[in-house]
Amino acid sequence: MNTITHEEANTVQPPLFFTDSAASKVKELIEEEANQALKLRVFVSGGGCSGFQYGFTFDEIINEDDFVIEKQGVRLLVDSMSVQYLLGAEIDYQENAQGAQFVIKNPAAASTCGCGSSFSV
């Protein structure tokens, strides 16, 4: 397990970034579930209209190969296979006229689909 806290992000380059907005929303969702053991897992899998797709789920388990990014007391988990597709990406939470959703801004994505949940490299 590789853990990077928000404080360490100033000295250690985290594999991806977790915005204040995303951390706040995850914290709110965890409080609604009344389970402080939950962490947000972000992963990449094959599929979608562009070849790869992003996924989000809550998980209580931190696997040995997980990268852990901690911010505002919230932990974001990324497995070692997915992290290679997410290097330098930003996980954000946005609310606008179309609704509210977690958004990944990924500099490694050569193209993305219109929905923003799948990409190609």
Curated annotation (Swiss-Prot):
Q: How is the cofactor bound?
A: Binds 1 iron-sulfur cluster per subunit.
Assigned keywords, A-Z: Iron, Iron-sulfur, Metal-binding
Cofactor(s) needed, names only, are:
iron-sulfur cluster
**Pfam (any one):** Fe-S_biosyn
Which GO terms are recorded in the biological process aspect for this UniProt protein? iron-sulfur cluster assembly
In its keyword annotation, does this UniProt entry include Translocase?
A: no
Residues spanning the signal sequence: none
Q: Which GO terms describe its molecular function?
A: 2 iron, 2 sulfur cluster binding; 4 iron, 4 sulfur cluster binding; iron ion binding
Q: Which residues bind iron-sulfur cluster?
A: C49, C113, C115
UniProt cross-references to InterPro entries, sorted A to Z: FeS_biogenesis, FeS_cluster_insertion, FeS_cluster_insertion_RrpA, HesB-like_dom_sf
ATP-binding among keywords:
no
Q: What does the similarity note say? A: Belongs to the HesB/IscA family.
What does this chain do? Required for insertion of 4Fe-4S clusters.
Assembly and binders: Homodimer.
- Any idea what this protein is called? Putative iron-sulfur cluster insertion protein ErpA
Q: Which organism is it from?
A: Nitrosomonas eutropha (strain DSM 101675 / C91 / Nm57)
Underlying gene: erpA
